[in-house]
Amino acid sequence: KRTIVIQGGPGTGKSVLAVNLLMEFINKSLNTCYATKNSAPREAFLSLLTHSDAKKQVNIKQLFRSPFGLSNVPDNTYDCLIVDEAHRLVKKMYGDWNGENQVKECISASLLSIFLLDEDQAVTVNDIGSIAEISKWCRELNSTLKMPAEAKLVSQFRCNGSDAYIQFIDDILQRTEESVTVDLDELNFDFRIFDSAIELREALREKNAINNKSRMVAGYCYDWN
């Protein structure tokens, strides 16, 4: 029984790697499943792989699941369980009456569990998918834990592939202990700080009038989130 942890910041290709691993294991006739708490990537990958063909979706849908309900899955049911966005795992979700801890249940359900995570992307107090939590349950369930250095993803696939942009944002938000010097002339981005929400709205409207591709993103600031 083995567990592998793959780390990577935002935009480093964790989900792309997860789906490629899924296809690789499926082609080897191994009972494999992709699991993530968020339904959006599951639905997106399902649509992409089946080209929205309903008949194909019936067969492929079983390759994608939520960690919800893994408490009812017998031990070692899967040859491999690939857990994307593992930092979003929680102890228990409403309605999962037999659930105890989703990290534990992911490891229990598979001979090989692969966790893809970024601890800095945990966004609520209920998120428990940390390396410490995974290590704890590996010891409890006698699963050999592997965290090879080469399994840490560092290349940036978003933001025009600019690692400097991510460093710049981290520095602005004071997320790093040391200040990072970034040559802004190399960044093809329009970065501004607004003192007025009205000015921000007007700037977005001007941008949106060009090609209708400008949006305000404000996740996890509303009561229903």
Question: Where are the language model's segments positioned?
Answer:
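Hydrophobic anchor at the beta1->P-loop junction of P-loop NTPases
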Residues: 6
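The conserved Walker
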Residues: 10
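Conserved glycine(s) of the Walker
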Residues: 13
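Walker A/P-loop NTP-binding motif
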Residues: 17-27
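Conserved helicase/translocase motor-coupling segment
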Residues: 18, 124-129, 148-167, 174-225
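Inter-Walker segment of RecA-like/P-loop motor cores
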Residues: 32-80
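Signature of the SF2 helicase/ATPase Hel1-core->accessory helical subdomain module
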Residues: 82-152
